[in-house]
Amino acid sequence: MDNDRSTVINIGGMDFELILTTRATKEIGKRYGGLGNLGDKLMKAENFEMALDEIIWLITLLANQAILIHNLRHKDAPKALLTEDDVELLTTPLDLTAYKASITEAMFKGTKRNVESEGPSKNTGTA
């Protein structure tokens, strides 16, 4: 996958790429009302269990984007999607806390804009 767009986490001894795609952005928008509301929702989770559920949902969503891309490109060798139950069973609450930085990095990479400057314009002549 493209390292400029993804970050890697280890879940249960297996590496998973987290990637923010347009599809993931739409799902986040449905759940939180937009990317801007995501941080507020995570910080204002009413209880510890709810906060864990939100992080697990996000990890599953972002990790499955890379799997879905793989499956699209390799129809002859599809990989199984990660489930929220898988993430719950293969992680500890401490792992989930550590994954927050990776989630943030994946979100940043997914929304990063590369601005390229052009050379001097042909129309900038000295008069």
Model-inferred region functions:
Residues 1-12, 30, 36-50, 67, ...:
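Charged interaction scaffolds used for protein-protein
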Residues 21:
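Residue-level signal for threonine
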